Amino acid sequence: MKKGVLIAFEGIDGSGKSSQATLLKDWIELKRDVYLTEWNSSDWIHDIIKEAKKKDLLTPLTFSLIHATDFSDRYERYILPMLKSGFIVISDRYIYTAYARDSVRGVDIDWVKKLYSFAIKPDITFYIRVSPDIALERIKKSKRKIKPQEAGADIFPGLSPEEGFLKYQGLITEVYDKLVKDENFIVIDGTKTPKEIQIQIRKFVGELIDNSF
């Protein structure tokens, strides 16, 4: 049986990581079974989280725990079984998103790491790195509104959406940058064109898949 491979994508909102994850999935499925999972997408917990955020019910600790519940559900029902069946699993955000988002809310990062210690580490993690300024410009050009969670509205309620976005995503970036060495992130320059980024990613993944037989 082919060996399952876990590929994770991380990056701030507006970095383009989701688009890259989808492009990679489309390429891989031409040759292998592939499954794409996204952060906060559990069948039964997603709507609960959405409603709790809308009503501003989440403290930093409950924010951490409820997202861990979402992840553990997807991990046990989809990610792990797919890997055991030989699938290539692409995760649009993985446990490192929790490390960053929870810790900037004041939750001890070592506690968060223990909370997610049941999860296996990815075979490769791509960190699509762009500055918050560039990410903000991309969102503005797309003509969509900044989501409250993208601006850290729960921890920076007094700031405008744009100010909150820059401050919050800046803090997230600082955590990601600290994780690069310890978690063996492959740092990708997110300012390159989507095509250039995808070519670079496929080179890494192609070698990984070839070695998974």
From Swiss-Prot:
CDD domains: TMPK. Keywords: ATP-binding, Kinase, Nucleotide biosynthesis, Nucleotide-binding, Transferase. The keyword Glycoprotein does not apply. It holds the Pfam family Thymidylate_kin. Its EC number is 2.7.4.9. This is Probable thymidylate kinase. ATP binds at residues 11-18. It comes from the Archaea. It catalyses: dTMP + ATP = dTDP + ADP.
